[in-house]
Amino acid sequence: HPAMLDPLANYIRRTGTPLISGTTGYSEEQMDVLRQLGKSAAVLYSANYSLGVALLRRILENFGPMLLADFDVELVEKHHNQKADAPSGTAKMLADALDPHRRLRRISGREGFCGARDRDEMGMFALRGGTVAGEHTLYFFGEDETLSFSHSAASRRIFAAGAVKAAELLAGKDPGFYTLDEILFSTADTERMD
């Protein structure tokens, strides 16, 4: 929970213990605290530790810019009825991967007479219900064709398994602020993933 960052940060500063955080809902100031902790310990942050989501993010980073030229993009995410934040941290992370310079205005749902869709917007829709562990789909609507990229978590076990794998790969790293991509996909660590 974001409210626990201060005591956690004090502990990390005191001990130099490596940190893996998957907490979503941090403010930009709190993210700066995590980055600063990287000066005294190995710190890894990701809004989602699923390998599938990490791969989806890479796909969006690599192919998103060419798709945005000719396609309208909409993002739909689904989670259980107890999820507190919307859109989810993963949805925001995927939107950032697709549009890192925020050229698209992010529209949280639409309602009423809102007029024609602008080319410079990305609709983001959050559905909540039942026990859905997490689903994220990005739709690319073009002229006479639609492309979609999806990830569905059948259970929350994948997040724990990914965090454990990340912890194994973070072990022995020098102090620094690391991303999941750096840990999972760096050439030095690729062999260790097997």
What does each model-identified segment do?
Residues D6-A9, Y49, R157-A160, V164:
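Hydrophobic alpha-helical segments
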Residues H1-P2, T23-T24, Y49, H80, ...:
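Short loop or secondary-structure boundary microenvironments that flank
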Residues P18-L19, N48, H80, F113:
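A short, structure-level motif marking secondary-structure boundaries and short turns
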Residues L68-D194:
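C-terminal substrate-binding/catalytic lobe of Rossmann-fold NAD(P)-dependent oxidoreductases
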Residues Y45-V53, H80-P87:
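Short, surface-exposed loop/turn motifs that are enriched in glycine and acidic residues
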Residues P2-T17, S21-Y45, L51-G64:
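Rossmann-fold NAD(P)-binding glycine/threonine-rich loop
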